[in-house]
């Protein structure tokens, strides 16, 4: 066999890791293109359907919330029943929901279908991480995560441009619908390739052999399947109660859910510990967090997602509403950011296996410096300079995003047992989703508060400077966590 090939117990067939990656990358790109294209198509969608501001907010929030609450339970189910099967189920749900969303007659129907889209994406996402952990090791795993970073960069670049072109060619109504419809051929291709290239039942036997000392065995037949339904429900409620206030700020009462979410998280941790102490197999083995690479890696990654995604949100708002730039022009301006992110991911993929902790530190410092440079660019734009000045610091931020993503995924999942790859990946992504929701709420809130200062009520400079100051602070916190992780890794070496 070549270095790209592998077998699984119970089958004489030889599988190819390159084919496996192709299958995994297709839905990843579908989901990310969907996010970036929908963000850019919201004005057209609002006009075509006559949507209210609260309805439009749920076009985004419903999708994100559904992903957040499904990730960890779906990862657990994949670890038990087989990741390939759950992957195909998630991809099927996402594809069918995308087609139906493109045909939605009202915003209410669209929002319901967006929830189903989020469920599909939430089911398949942890399986991708689990499958990489299971079938890739060492530098091959690092390269796989680097290719994921490249796919993310391409998707982020394509989304806004694709939606802008579709709306320009077909008008507002057909244009936003086309953004959903493009998922049908891609999803069908992913399902066909997955049916031929994923191991399915053989994978479960392989997991069973892997699980001799690390936890619950996974086999084709067994007398008891321990799903820990109470733990699953507690975590779903916790994620929902914490994320909802930051994503639906139409009424002050929603902030009362936040302390309930924190309480729910405390109860969930206590339940999982007690459940394991009684000889059961909890949904999430909290001992995973005692692994320095996984525990600190999850924390560092979540902090990074508090600093990073909010930047693009406020830049898009500022350029379109404050400077008067079109949606397509914003997409073109952020294209160099996406390209440099791809380069950062590939560069990091070559070096993360040995220098991943140092790359994390470098990336977070680069976010701090480039955010300060972006503030200077905004100052110049407000004084008459071209808005293209903002593209320069965004290029460096893109490189930092790509480099950090590949390094953090590699380090965080490095010591995770293959049998826990799905649940570990789901928990990691849940932390990132929650951090993103919290960050966007805080940073955009500061942005609009600053923007309202002054007699004119449109002080865009103050809004951007204050918001970027928050980003710099969050990035500095991430740097601190990354430095701690770097010191631990140096001692291990």
For the regions a language model picked out, list residue spans one by one:
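Intrinsic disorder in cytosolic terminal tails and internal cytosolic loops
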Residues: 1-16, 203-221, 484-493
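Transmembrane-helix bundle of Major Facilitator Superfamily
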Residues: 2-196, 375, 445, 449
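12-transmembrane solute porter fold
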Residues: 17-33, 38-40, 279-492
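Hydrophobic residues within membrane-embedded alpha-helical segments of Major Facilitator Superfamily
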Residues: 30, 39-42, 71, 93, ...
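Structural signature of transmembrane alpha-helices in multi-pass secondary transporters
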Residues: 31, 60-63, 67, 117-118, ...
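Membrane-helix interface/capping residues of multi-pass secondary transporters
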Residues: 53, 83, 107, 138, ...
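Alpha-helical transmembrane segments of multi-pass secondary-active solute transporters
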Residues: 56-57, 86, 144, 178-182, ...
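Hydrophobic transmembrane-helix bundles of small-molecule transporters
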Residues: 169, 173-299
């Amino acid at each position: 066999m070549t270095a790209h090939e592998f077998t699984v117990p119970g089958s004489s067939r030889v599988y190819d890791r390159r084919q496996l990656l192709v299958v995994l990358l297709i839905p990843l790109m579908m989901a990310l293109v969907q996010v970036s294209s929908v963000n850019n198509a919201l004005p057209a969608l609002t006009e075509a359907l006559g949507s209210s501001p609260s309805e439009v907010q749920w076009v985004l929030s419903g999708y994100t919330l559904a992903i957040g609450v499904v990730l960890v339970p779906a990862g657990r189910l994949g670890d038990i029943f087989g990741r390939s099967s759950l992957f195909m189920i998630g991809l099927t749900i996402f594809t069918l929901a995308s087609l139906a969303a493109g045909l939605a007659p009202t915003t209410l129907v669209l929002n319901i279908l967006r929830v189903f889209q989020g469920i599909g994406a939430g089911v398949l996402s942890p399986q991708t991480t689990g499958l990489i952990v299971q079938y890739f090791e060492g530098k091959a795993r690092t390269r796989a995560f680097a290719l994921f970073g490249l796919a993310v960069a391409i998707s982020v670049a394509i989304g806004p441009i694709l939606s802008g072109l579709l709306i320009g060619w077909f008008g507002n109504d057909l244009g936003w619908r086309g953004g959903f419809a493009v998922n049908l051929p891609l999803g069908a291709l992913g399902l066909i390739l997955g049916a031929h290239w994923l191991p399915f039942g053989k994978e479960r036997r392989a997991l069973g052999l892997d699980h001799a000392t690390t936890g619950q065995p996974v086999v084709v037949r067994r007398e008891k399947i321990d799903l820990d339904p109470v733990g699953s429900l507690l975590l779903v409620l916790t994620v929902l109660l914490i994320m909802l206030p930051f994503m639906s700020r139409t009424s002050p009462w929603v902030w009362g859910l936040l302390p309930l979410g924190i309480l729910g998280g405390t109860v969930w941790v206590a339940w999982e510990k007690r459940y394991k102490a009684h000889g059961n197999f909890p949904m999430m083995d909290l001992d995973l967090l005692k692994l320095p690479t996984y525990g600190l890696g999850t924390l560092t990654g979540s902090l990074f997602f508090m600093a990073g995604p909010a930047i693009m949100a406020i830049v898009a708002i500022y350029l379109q509403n404050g400077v008067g730039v079109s949606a397509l022009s914003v997409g073109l301006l952020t294209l160099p950011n996406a390209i440099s992110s791809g380069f950062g991911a590939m560069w990091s993929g070559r070096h993360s296996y040995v220098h991943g902790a140092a790359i994390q530190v470098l990336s977070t410092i680069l976010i701090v410096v480039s955010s300060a440079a972006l503030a200077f660019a905004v100052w110049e734009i407000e004084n008459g300079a071209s808005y293209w000045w903002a593209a320069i610091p965004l290029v460096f931020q893109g490189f930092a995003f790509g480099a950090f993503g590949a390094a953090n995924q590699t380090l965080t999942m490095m010591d995770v047992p293959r049998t826990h790859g799905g649940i570990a990946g789901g928990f990691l992504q849940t932390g990132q989703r929650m951090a993103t929701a919290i960050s966007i709420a805080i940073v955009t809130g500061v942005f609009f508060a600053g923007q309202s200062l002054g007699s004119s009520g449109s002080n865009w400079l103050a809004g951007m400077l204050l918001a970027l100051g928050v980003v710099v602070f969050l990035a500095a916190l991430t740097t601190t966590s990354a430095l701690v992780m770097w010191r631990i890794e140096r001692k291990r070496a």
